[in-house]
């Protein structure tokens, strides 16, 4: 049986992640409160951010920036702003 969580991003019960994907306390918070669907949405935004801003995951400042964006996106409902990106109709 699939594990369900009350997803803070989607504001509904949904399938939870299979295991903790992010380390530490933030990772536990994500595992306990974020669904697979919401995590997938974040991963798309994360990829766009890394590419647009040319982030280097070996750089501590870039990782910190990405973590701040992830927290804002998943827990505060703030969308990630990506310069020059215009979503297709119906994908907003």
Curated annotation (Swiss-Prot):
Single Gene Ontology BP annotation: cellular response to oxidative stress
One CC-aspect GO term: cytosol
GO molecular function: iron ion binding
Keyword vocabulary terms for this entry: Iron
Pfam families on file: Iron_traffic
SUPFAM superfamilies: YggX-like
InterPro entries noted in UniProt: Fe_traffick_prot_YggX (IPR007457), Fe_traffick_prot_YggX_sf (IPR036766)
Family affiliation: Belongs to the Fe(2+)-trafficking protein family.
Function of the molecule: Could be a mediator in iron transactions between iron acquisition and iron-requiring processes, such as synthesis and/or repair of Fe-S clusters in biosynthetic enzymes.
This protein's name: Probable Fe(2+)-trafficking protein
Organism: Shewanella sp. (strain ANA-3)
